[in-house]
From Swiss-Prot:
Biased segments, Basic and acidic residues type: 281-293, 330-346
Protein name: Myc proto-oncogene protein
Keywords of this entry: Acetylation, Activator, Chromosome, Cytoplasm, DNA-binding, Glycoprotein, Isopeptide bond, Nucleus, Phosphoprotein, Proto-oncogene, Transcription, Transcription regulation, Ubl conjugation
Modification N6-acetyllysine, positions: 159, 164, 173, 290, 332, 338, 386
Biased composition (Acidic residues): 266-278
Subunit details: Efficient DNA binding requires dimerization with another bHLH protein. Binds DNA as a heterodimer with MAX. Interacts with TAF1C and SPAG9. Interacts with PARP10. Interacts with KDM5A and KDM5B. Interacts (when phosphorylated at Thr-73 and Ser-77) with FBXW7. Interacts with PIM2. Interacts with RIOX1. The heterodimer MYC:MAX interacts with ABI1; the interaction may enhance MYC:MAX transcriptional activity. Interacts with TRIM6. Interacts with NPM1; the binary complex is recruited to the promoter of MYC target genes and enhances their transcription.
Localization of this protein: Nucleus, Nucleoplasm; Nucleus, Nucleolus; Nucleus; Cytoplasm
Residues annotated as domain bHLH: 369-421
Source organism of this protein record: Mus musculus (Mouse)
Annotated Gene Ontology cellular component terms: axon; euchromatin; Myc-Max complex; nuclear body; nucleolus; nucleoplasm; nucleus; perinuclear region of cytoplasm
Length: 454
């Protein structure tokens, strides 16, 4: 048994680094080389709990990278080493230190609290730069885009940042009862654990290369003059700045879509969250009125007219029906007085037609009646034309028994037959004239014979 135990121990010793390397496959690139020497069971449990609590959402392409065994880190993330002299310490120290506008309030964070806070912040890759940068600075938005614009998405980054900042803002407001001296001492002790958190920010890619749209609207007045109380709520600031401009409908991007409520048991934090949500909703509700006031102000010359719904009106169209069977009417020239009367009658007819347009049902019925009468007249005209062709065909000796003779043949044969009849008529009239002359001559000769015999 001792021999078997001695054989099994080197196997476990050799397999331990492999397991450690396998667990660290999805961590940052700059820590893969040194992570197996510092990781322990507590660290593994910490990251496992962090993934269970959804503080760091997994990237959508994480399964693909596991399949191909690649690292899902686009640019280098900032270093996590702690130091003493870093510009990032100034931002965090000033954010948690008492200000002049606060009524003697200050931070009550001890050294252990600062360590716990930093470990939580260092746990999420997308919060490293966004929390430490100045909210009024452009790098506050750029750093989120640098780290997660291609992997975790904007909505996950905005949600995580807003949750972190809302929780620390509530903790800062709860700590306003302590003295400012203690706040300064705590901030001075916290400087030992904050350094180089933004040291690698200059090595990252410029977000303008990755993201073609403008990051923030520098022309909006509300985003530039943000108050200290809303300095830690970038989602509400972005919403208010996007709603402040009157023509903010084609806004290119709003990084923080909504402010999620914090998961805390304190009633004060819930009330503060409700107040923040109410401010955003009231601002959204008041934006149409502000837009209407800004559109009606004379200073803006390019205000849009109010959009009126399209009203379709059906008017009466006078259609003159021509009876083709009727003989052509001769045009008469009316005198000036009669012409004026006719013009006035036409105007009255147009007015009556315009009045009829107000009732669409009556106009529909009138149009249907006119269409029906037009169809009846057209049918009658075609029937009469067909009967006339049949009668003409019956008069022609060559086409008398041909029922399927086309109309063109009927017309040609009819013209030829008419010309022949006219020629016969001329011959007969000439013969008649000759016979009349002959009769006159015979009568005259008969009278001469009677006179001579008497």
């Amino acid at each position: 048994m001792d021999f078997l135990w001695a054989l099994e121990t080197p196997q476990t010793a050799t397999t331990m680094p492999l397991n450690v390397n396998f667990t660290n496959r999805n961590y940052d690139l700059d820590y893969d080389s040194v992570q197996p020497y510092f990781i322990c069971d507590e660290e593994e449990n910490f990251y496992h709990q962090q993934q269970q609590s959804e503080l760091q959402p997994p990237a959508p392409s994480e399964d693909i990278w596991k399949k191909f065994e690649l690292l899902p880190t686009p640019p280098l993330s900032p270093s996590r080493r702690s130091g003493l002299c870093s510009p990032s310490y100034v931002a965090v120290a000033t954010s948690f230190s008492p200000r002049e506008d606060d009524d003697g309030g200050g931070g009550n964070f001890s050294t252990a609290d600062q360590l716990e806070m930093m470990t939580e912040l260092l746990g999420g890759d997308m919060v490293n730069q966004s929390f430490i940068c100045d909210p009024d600075d452009e790098t506050f938005i750029k750093n989120i885009i640098i780290q997660d614009c291609m992997w975790s998405g904007f909505s996950a980054a905005a949600k995580l940042v807003s949750e972190k900042l809302a929780s620390y803002q509530a903790a800062r407001k709860d700590s306003t009862s302590l003295s400012p001296a203690r706040g300064h001492s705590v901030c001075s002790t916290s400087s030992l654990y904050l350094q180089d958190l933004t040291a690698a920010a200059s090595e990252c890619i410029d977000p303008s290369v990755v993201f073609p749209y403008p990051l923030n609207d520098s022309s909006s007045p509300k985003s530039c003059t943000s108050s200290d109380s809303t300095a830690f709520s970038p989602s509400s600031d972005s919403l208010l700045s996007s709603e402040s401009s009157p023509r903010a409908s084609p806004e290119p991007l709003v990084l923080h879509e909504e402010t999620p409520p914090t998961t805390s048991s304190d009633s004060e934090e819930e009330q503060e969250d409700e107040e923040e949500i109410d401010v955003v909703s009231v601002e959204k509700r008041q934006t149409p009125a502000k837009r209407s006031e800004s559109g009606s102000s004379p200073s803006r010359g390019h205000s849009k007219p109010p959009h009126s719904p399209l009203v379709l009106k059906r008017c009466h169209v006078s259609t003159h029906q021509h009876n083709y069977a009727a003989p052509p009417s001769t045009r008469k020239d009316y005198p000036a007085a009669k012409r004026a009367k006719l013009d006035s009658g036409r105007v009255l007819k147009q007015i009556s037609n315009n009045r009829k347009c107000s009732s669409p049902r009556s106009s529909d019925t009138e149009e249907n009646d006119k269409r029906r009468t037009h169809n009846v007249l057209e049918r009658q005209r075609r029937n009469e034309l067909k009967r006339s062709f049949f009668a003409l065909r019956d008069q022609i000796p060559e086409l008398e028994n041909n029922e399927k003779a086309p109309k063109v043949v009927i017309l040609k044969k009819a013209t030829a037959y008419i010309l022949s009849i006219q020629a016969d008529e001329h011959k007969l009239t000439s013969e008649k004239d000759l016979l009349r002359k002959r009769r006159e001559q015979l009568k005259h000769k008969l009278e001469q014979l009677r006179n001579s015999g008497a």
